[in-house]
UniProtKB/Swiss-Prot annotation:
May function in transferrin receptor internalization at the plasma membrane through a cargo-specific control of clathrin-mediated endocytosis. Alternatively, may act as a negative regulator of the amino acid-induced TOR signaling by inhibiting the formation of active Rag GTPase complexes. Preferentially binds inactive Rag GTPase complexes and prevents their interaction with the mTORC1 complex inhibiting its relocalization to lysosomes and its activation. Thereby, may indirectly regulate cell growth, proliferation and autophagy. The lineage of its organism: Eukaryota, Metazoa, Chordata, Craniata, Vertebrata. Disulfide bonds: none annotated. It comes from Mus musculus (Mouse). Phosphorylated upon EGF stimulation. Phosphorylation prevents interaction with DNM2. GO terms for biological process: cellular response to amino acid stimulus; endocytosis; negative regulation of cell growth; negative regulation of cell population proliferation; negative regulation of GTPase activity; negative regulation of TOR signaling; positive regulation of autophagy; protein localization to lysosome. GO terms for molecular function: GDP-dissociation inhibitor activity; identical protein binding; small GTPase binding. Pfam families: DEATH_SH3BP4, SH3_1, SH3_2, SH3BP4_C, UPA_SH3BP4, ZU5. Homodimer or homooligomer. Interacts with DNM2, EPS15, clathrin, the adapter protein complex 2/AP-2 and TFRC. Interacts with the Rag GTPases RRAGA, RRAGB, RRAGC and RRAGD; the interaction is most probably direct, preferentially occurs with their inactive GDP-bound form and is negatively regulated by amino acids. This is SH3 domain-binding protein 4. PROSITE patterns: SH3, ZU5.
Amino acid sequence: MAAQRIRAANASGLPRCKSEGTLIDLSEGFSETSFNDVKVPSPSALLVDNPTPFGNAKEVIAIKDYCPNNFTTLKFSKGDHLYVLDTSGGEWWYAHNTTEMGYIPSSYVQPLNYRNSTLSDSGMIDNLPDSPEEVAKELDLLGGGWTDDQKESGRPYSNNPFWNGVRTNPFLNGNAQPSTDELNPKSTVDLLLFDTGTSSFTESSSATTNSTGNIFDELPATNGLQVEQPVKRDNPFFRSKRSYSLSELSVLQAKSDAPPTSSFFTGLKSPVPEQFQSREDFRTAWLNHRKLARSCHDLDLLGQSPGWGQTQAVETNIVCKLDSSGGSVQLPDTNISIHVPEGHVAPGETQQISMKALLDPPLDLNSDRSTSVSPVVEVKLSNLEVSTFIILEMKVSAEVKGDIFSKSTVVLQCLRSDSKEGPYVPIPLAYSYGDTIQVQLDNLEPCMYLAIVAQGPNILYPSTVWDFINKRVTVGLYGPKHIHPSFKTVVTIFGHDCAPKTLLVSEVTRQAPSPAPVALQLWGKHQFILSRPQDLRVCMFSNMTNYEVKANEQARVVRGFQMKLGKVSRLIFSVISQNPNELSDFTLRVQVKDDQDTILTQFCVQTPQPPPKSAIKPSGQRRFLKKNEVGKIILSPFVVTTKYPTFQDRPVSSLKFGKLLKTVVRQNKSHYLLEYKKGDVVALLSEERIRLKGQLWTKEWYIGYYQGKVGLVHTKNVLVVGKARPSLFSGPELSTSVLLEQILRPCKFLTYIYASVRTLLMENISSWRAFADALGYGNLPLTFFCRAELDSEPERVASVLEKLKEDCNNPDNKDRKSFQKELVMALLKMDCQGLVVRLIQDFVLLTTAVEVAQRWRELAEKLAKVSKQQMDAYESPHRDRNGVVDSEAMWKPAYDFLLTWSHQIGDSYRDVIQELHIGLDKMKNPITRRWKHLTGTLILVNSLDILRAAAFSPADHDDFVI
């Protein structure tokens, strides 16, 4: 029966799997001709006009013996020729030896002719022959005949995985000739594993691989005939020593569809022997060229960032510590968790649990009778002195079918191993219902690997385990954070439901160090039930005419054996915009079809937005927006509420205290830098640090309260002792009213635009009465602020604001007040902190623009390294008829720049003011030396949280405006 089954399988012309072995039915008699019944594609059969599905196999040669330890790997000896079908496994390649198929370790083989003189890159001229005849003989082998009729002849190079019709050995010919097959159109449906691809990502590097990281695609094998120029045998250099090089490949690799370019690299060609009078001159020139070629890459092509050589999913992991009370640890974005019962470790001890999801299963877990239905979960424990077990719970990607026969044939089984590659042993399930399972783990080890498989040990051919389960396959679409005029997406197919949020894409080059990998984001994923492992055709389309998927990349094929082995498949699609000036988000439709072109599933994914138009980036390190900052900066014109809190004048309790380690007396007095004496105690408003320049260099500072003043104290001069108030603390107690008065000191020195202030208040204050009370106009009627009756609440708010402006600017008023300070104080008493920080940020940017004025270009370079063209663009709207900007109007381009720059920084008002202060400190003659109030503003915005926490009742916060 086994032999009949093998013959039936081989009747279709497909090679057998290693797991079937070489079986002969002895009952039918044994003869030597029995082996001839096993038919597989030969190397020559792979090169016919109508190739088999394995027509893109790449020939390699074994460099050492390999004896397999499981049924899925292939045995071979040193010197054997193998034919690789898939290199996506990284360390393991899928290959056949014209008899059997299986996995081989990639380190045990080399591409055919890898050490040939045209491909070696040893960096030396070695293996010198003893006679000219030996060189000529070798060149005969490499270049064919020496006659002139070779112009019309051709020679196939399909067996050489690196050959693509470009000659790189200067001892053969210095002129690169295209192959005839480059003129032939490619099929629009390319195999995933061996796409010879002409897309830009294969051009971006000298050795950029395709979506599977296949090294054979660095220089794709051609299927046609190479057009060669005759090799001049009478040239004396061809009678001399041979040389080896692979260096020029990064320069000479040109694709048939690439337009000619005129750049520095266009003229970077190998020297031709005929150009030199002696062998030594040519050798020196050629070695110099190779040295240059090894260190250079075509920057025009590399500029098509990012490189797209290899894709690697970022494995999801988590590390957590639990004490004796137990708890649960869940892998982020997955349905995998570990439950630790109470009393697992002794009181006072901890258990550190590390979990990681490995996406590609080992080879042993998938066959006709078994298939993996979960990622391999790596569990590491720090403490083995435990008294209880732990429970692993997860959802799997398959369910056994509901009929009795399926339930009796296939079961879900948990396998465990101490090594990632196995061997795996089964352990019983504690609980199983539908697609949810629980496993009780005892006999704990420091490192364990666990996987769930659907197994049917008694399944007979031709049935497989897939016939008895409903297995879900996950399709994920990954792309960049923002879309661009030309970008690439990666479609991944997982044999389980664990799709990571990030996919790393790195460019493969022969350059060291390699470029940093680019992280792609998961745009969307979709699951569908796959009835059996089969070839899948994945197509992608755009719903907008402005965007199109490259024609030769609209469809990709995933081989059925990859689905059977549970390997993650990665397919790259290039998307191009027809009009780069009209970028917008759009929808991509992904279709998955079977080998009969029937749609199995399809889904749509919305792309992200294009990036902001300005390329200005913050110069400093970005700090994450604090949770309590998020709601404060968002202002809405639709806030409708009449209830405002009452500002409470009470002591500030949430202070920390520190002992001063040094006496500081400042020669240049500043309102915002404290002077103090060694041994005294200072109260710290928080332990958050502020960065600004001291006398010589940038330092870190705490906001402190000492002897009735709020200011900055150098962090190295303070020893933080905690929240307990020391008995040595002297000076008046810090209350909310004192703190409010102290931090508002710089407000009266800030410049403002009244119209913008009026608009903001009209949009965000919903009660003119509360606003008037906070300003000190208590119990005054509306007619006191305006003569006519106003119908809308925003107009009433504007009338109150107008009254404040008149009072502050009245020269007859003996006690003149600052408009900015009174306004900010009133808003803080109303708990409108979001509105305050918006006003403060606008005030600071405008004041800085006015103070910097004509020096704004220097500030722009310090903040964002703005180019001269960008600076001119900021000034162009403000130029007069003579094309110059008046000195009194120079604040306008400065303000335009600062507004644009602040939007690039983000929503954190603290970061905007902090980075602005650092940028001003970096100027040659910084204005912060004479204009200290930006430092006070930095103290203000960093003290708002503690003021708000002390002045208002937390129980009422939910009912108030921002």
